[in-house]
Design a protein with these regions (language model features):
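Serine endopeptidase catalytic core focused on the charge-relay Asp
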Residues: 121, 132-152, 156-316, 324-327, ...
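Protease-domain processing segments flanking chymotrypsin-fold serine proteases, especially trypsin-like
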Residues: 1-153, 290-297
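C-terminal subregion of chymotrypsin/trypsin-like serine protease catalytic domains
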Residues: 2-28, 37, 41, 300-308, ...
């Protein structure tokens, strides 16, 4: 098998009791609603090819989840037991099942409900240990949408009246104004809702009043939006405006091992058809545009550009999401690009600590 089984070995290496972990996690509902596609490092492409096999094309009959997971259990045990995992021989069914098992222990995309997240999959117990601080971050991330038009992206609070998002998100509803600055397009009324969770019956919506600035450097996909201090409409009982997220003004301290981060955002369905429909359904359970916690690792920091890459599970709709350091819970990045068969990229915000646009707008670096 070569690289696919090597990737599987790496994905499963943090799971000491593999058989028990599969028994605990491998139910169809959990596969669909609690985990998402793992994001391999840029040079590790075989997992995507395995997913193509699993998708099976538009005419493929739906797979039996129990059979797929049993095939995956058998394949995972073969990989675990082999002295040479890269040369393990697997049947086609075992290859498909192995991908499903990897998803259980790979990069999850956990649904946020009532401001918190479910028990994470095996290998991500660190999220539970950091739960209170992660929940604090979750509250300050919202879904940017247009009244009567739907979602356009994600944003997060970086000052009491300031939301950060991507340039390409802001440009959906704004355009350059005569004499400088930016103005809203006719008929576009942007707002941000800090809840928008699955099955939520309440909202916490704030009007976006102005574009404070859009970065002129084409390498920096960043925009800043002014928001009103008080919500519009009815909010949940006891609701208070979310806290400002601390933005790191210094580089993350990278040790010898993986450097864990997490994204909070609103992944949306792939309307461009890049991701096979069967893959989207199997991984996300047809649940999109709601708040999710998406942990992963930093994979590279550019030496020449103000950006870094990460392997959190993201889709369209995550544009404008914060990338938070799991050690410090400070925002280190602004996610701006990524998806099926792509690397994930974020603006390295610590490199902009002295940037005039961010400084003058009031971004609070720490």
């Amino acid at each position: 098998m070569g690289e696919p089984t090597a990737l599987a070995e790496r994905a499963l290496e943090q799971v000491p009791d593999l058989d028990a972990a599969i028994d605990e996690l491998a139910t169809p509902s959990r596969v669909l609603s609690r985990v998402a596609r793992p994001r391999p490092r840029p040079q590790e492409g075989p997992l995507e090819s395995m997913m193509d096999v699993a998708a099976g094309g538009a005419s493929a009959p739906p797979a039996d989840p129990e059979r797929v997971l049993e095939d995956g259990r058998r394949a995972a045990m073969k990989v675990r037991a082999s002295a040479d995992p890269q040369h393990v021989t697997l049947t086609l069914d075992e290859q498909v099942g192995l991908e499903a098992v990897i998803l259980l222990f790979g990069r999850p995309a956990l649904l946020v409900q009532h401001g918190t997240f479910p028990t994470p999959p095996a290998g991500w117990e660190a999220l539970d240990a950091e739960r209170p601080r992660i929940e604090h971050s979750i509250r300050s991330v919202g879904r940017i949408e247009l009244l009567n038009r739907g979602m356009v992206g994600t944003g997060f609070l970086v000052a009491p009246d300031l939301v950060m998002t991507n340039r390409h998100v802001a440009e959906v509803f704004s355009l350059p104004a005569d004499g400088g600055g930016w103005t809203f397009k006719l008929g576009r009324t942007p707002v941000i809702d800090y809840i928008d969770e699955r099955d939520a019956i309440t909202s916490a919506t704030y009007k976006i009043t102005a574009v404070a600035g859009i970065h002129t450097d084409v390498r920096i996909d960043l925009a800043l939006l002014r928001v009103e201090a008080n919500p519009i409409g009815v909010v949940p009982a006891g609701w208070t405006t979310p806290a400002v997220l601390p933005v790191s003004g210094t580089p993350p301290v990278i040790g010898d091992g993986e450097h864990h981060v997490y994204v909070v955002g609103y992944p949306a369905t792939d309307n461009q058809g890049v991701t096979p429909p069967d893959v989207m359904m199997r991984i996300f359970g047809d649940v999109y545009e709601v708040k999710r916690l998406q942990p992963g690792t930093m994979t590279a920091i550019s030496a020449t550009l103000p950006r870094f890459s990460h392997d959190c599970s993201t889709l369209g709709g995550n544009s404008g999401s914060c990338v938070v350091d799991l050690q410090t819970h400070q925002v280190i990045g602004l996610h701006f690009s990524g998806g099926y068969r792509e690397s994930n990229y974020a603006v390295a915000l610590w490199k902009l600590a002295d940037d005039p646009l961010l400084r003058d707008a009031g971004v609070q670096f720490v």
